[in-house]
Design a protein with these regions (language model features):
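Acidic, low-complexity proline/glycine-rich segments
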Residues: 1-4, 118
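Mg2+-dependent prenyl diphosphate-binding active-site environment of isoprenoid biosynthetic enzymes
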Residues: 20-126
Length: 126
């Protein structure tokens, strides 16, 4: 038999369930976030604006956390996993931007979708 869970309760349970993963990947995720911020720079003024909008819109960064955790579980000791995790997050973000254009979404994570601010073409190109 199924159980209906309120959205607020579901969010709290989800956050609690990934807390051990967040803690286990904290140091490497700090480096991933630094990498993401560093790579969002550009001489084209709109690119950092769109990037900042996306970064500030939240999200759990679950995919890069899983990348970091997988590297750790496999005994990886290098630093390449940070770049890989950043790449995974960039790819995910690109799919979200594209999805918002295709679906003509006005909002992403409760904020105006990038396409609503900068238009469809700019959102896809960034």
């Amino acid at each position: 038999m199924g159980v209906v869970v309120s959205l607020d309760e579901g969010k709290r349970k989800a956050a609690a369930s990934i807390a051990p993963l967040v803690e286990a990947t904290r140091d490497a995720m700090d480096r991933v976030n630094e990498l993401i911020l560093d790579r969002c720079g550009s001489d084209v003024g709109m690119i950092p604006e769109v990037a900042r909008h996306l970064i500030d819109s939240g999200g759990k960064r679950l995919r890069p956390m899983l990348t970091i955790a997988s590297a750790s579980m496999c005994g990886y000791r290098g630093s390449g996993h940070v770049k890989l995790a950043g790449s995974v997050e960039f790819m995910h973000t690109a799919t979200l931007l594209h999805d918002d254009v295709v679906d003509e979404s006005d909002l992403r994570r409760g904020k105006l979708a990038a396409r609503m601010i900068w238009g469809n073409q700019a959102s896809v190109l960034v």
